[in-house]
Amino acid sequence: MNFPLIRQQPWYPGQMGVPGSDVSRGLRTQPNGIVLFVDGNHPNATTTADGTDPNNPLSTITAAMAKLVAFHALSEVQAEGSTIVIAPGTYTDSIAIDRTSYPPDCSIIGCGNSKFDVVWVPAAGDALSIDQSGWLIDGIHFQPAADGAGVKLTWNAGAGAEDTIIQNCFFDGRWGTGLYGVEFEGAPANCTIQDCRFAEFDTAQPCITITATPTASPYQTHILRNTFQEAVEYITIEAGGFNASIIAGNHFVQATGDLGATTTYINLGTGSLGYNQVVGNYFDGDYSNTGGYTAETNGNDNWVGNFAADVAEAEVGDNGITVAEPAA
């Protein structure tokens, strides 16, 4: 029997009679890397499954990461560009991605929706700690543990989680249960947090924070188009500060008080450079230092062009547009 040779897009499976159209490493968008499927609810799922077939998936994220590490050790650099695809369900893994065992430039993709999402809720510690470059995290509902972050990004020895992208995720503090949404430790550069939702973090449990600066402060962090609500602290620092970063297009909402009033909307701390751009955001509450808005201490940030509800401040025009950094 002759089968037609049909040209199709890369995301279609291989076809009978088309040499080379099927591969043993899963559906991929580039020639290197591997695609591994995780589905804790699938009847065929096990921790020892092949994982490259969605009908023979791995049951845990931990098992998928072990497969990726083994593949990387076997093929060296060809593991770059790998993807972990996670089906809807609740996962309790705690993953630490290091620079030695894991390849750079890989993706973790949650394939859920508003009704059935991918919930990542570790029993303890960080859900995901990254010390490797270029990873993409997309579509995950993080519920951090009481002693960890949803995602922790590190840079402690001259290299680390630079170029990380976190997008389309929900960081859910569960009314004060989770410790941090996204935690920076050290100075990972060029990290992007975009189109995410942060909510329900309590006092000393900020949505985004820097906890330590053993090398330097984060550089060129982009925090774009996120929503922050029902939390006491949104973007703040426990050490250091942000440098040459852009915070744009975000929506900061004053908490209703179920946990407590919002005390910190943005505190950019004390970086080594400053030069942050805080533009095009919506600011609720009191636009002042006492109200929870604090520029980086070098005095060279740009906070012009935000929408603020507090038109009584001298730093806010009568039209609600900020014209200067927040003051005391």
Region spans (language model):
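Right-handed parallel beta-helix/beta-spiral solenoid domain characteristic of secreted/periplasmic
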Residues: 94, 103-152, 173-175, 201-202
